[in-house]
Amino acid sequence: MRPEESWSRVGLVQCEEADSALEEPINVEEEDGGLQICRVCGDKANGYHFNVMTCEGCKGFFRRAMKRNVRLRCPFRKGTCEITRKTRRQCQACRLRKCLESGMKKEMIMSDAAVEQRRALIKRKKREKIEAPPPGGQGLTEEQQALIQELMDAQMQTFDTTFSHFKDFRLPAVFHSGCELPEFLQASLLEDPATWSQIMKDRVPMKISLQLRGEDGSIWNYQPPSKSDGKEIIPLLPHLADVSTYMFKGVINFAKVISYFRDLPIEDQISLLKGATFEMCILRFNTMFDTETGTWECGRLAYCFEDPNGGFQKLLLDPLMKFHCMLKKLQLHKEEYVLMQAISLFSPDRPGVVQRSVVDQLQERFALTLKAYIECSRPYPAHRFLFLKIMAVLTELRSINAQQTQQLLRIQDSHPFATPLMQELFSSTDG
């Protein structure tokens, strides 16, 4: 046997072993329920290849032998070796002879260019299948499109993202490191030390800084005192009350623009706003949150928690920061944010709601619109769980809302800071 013939035979065997490792034969049943067998080696066949029912191994062998166009000789010099699944690797010449005798045709082998074309077509179809919307995702109905447009218009009219109209607000005094709180604040805290002690059980030192950029380009900074005893929140309370009230007014106006909300009885409107205003504000604040710096960019104002694992409320800050980071990672569209606000607003289980069934139907309508929007605008299946994630986020937001309200009421009892609107929103809606 010439060296090149032996070398070619070894190459064909190695390629076949690689094919066998990559792809197992597929069982093909005959009409009577039996298994189809390879007409060359008797192994289980997986379909017609080059005009003959064969296994995957013989298909690959025949294609490689024809493309290489090598002369194969029977090492046993008989030329009539029996080809079976166990012996097919022993004599490549007789195996090729059996392929041709079985009817396999060289002209049916695809060229390399045709193979590449076919692979590209398969990849394209696979990609199109992945990016195609899920079953039932046929796009938004006209009613859903109108619903989203109404919410987007309401958001644009009532959400001052640059805080350009936020001008009348109080600022904390500028403290230096180690400076004590003003005497009037110390006196107010000493009036009811038991109450403040109760508040401090749920508090850890706060590390929040505030930066204000003036219209003339000047910059005013507030840094919390280095001494952290939990009371450094007090100087910021009036300012935080003002910025919260400004956001609350925007959210209330957002609700009033929505026709479905205006159609509800005034009592239900009040109950829904009392329950959802804080949640809707958090959703709006999230659009201005930078996860890398932990900063909220609110126009000329910038709020930064320097120590997110410490500061503010032990029961409030950690869940709130985690919530903002979790929500921001979803990379939501503006349409998804406004639909979340609507779902939060139209919650039928808010205290004091009378027309629960009506509100429940409205909430379901907004939820279905959100689901349809995701299905027709997000790649599938990469975002197939986004709707469920958003609904879980809204559930978590309800929990944060309850914790926040309790903390604010407790601080308010010890050191009144809330604006009239805040007091109205956080007042009891029972009965």
Swiss-Prot record:
**Residues covered by the NR LBD domain:** 143-430
Please provide an example of a Pfam family that matches this protein in its UniProt record: Hormone_recep
Single GO MF annotation:
RNA polymerase II transcription regulatory region sequence-specific DNA binding
Give, as residue ranges, the zinc fingers classified NR C4-type: 38-58, 74-99
Sequence motif Bipartite nuclear localization signal, location on chain: 63-89
Q: What does this protein do?
A: Nuclear receptor that binds and is activated by a variety of endogenous and xenobiotic compounds. Transcription factor that activates the transcription of multiple genes involved in the metabolism and secretion of potentially harmful xenobiotics, endogenous compounds and drugs. Response to specific ligands is species-specific, due to differences in the ligand-binding domain. Binds to a response element in the promoters of the CYP3A4 and ABCB1/MDR1 genes.
Q: Provide the protein name.
A: Nuclear receptor subfamily 1 group I member 2
Organism whose genome encodes this protein: Mus musculus
The gene coding this protein? Nr1i2
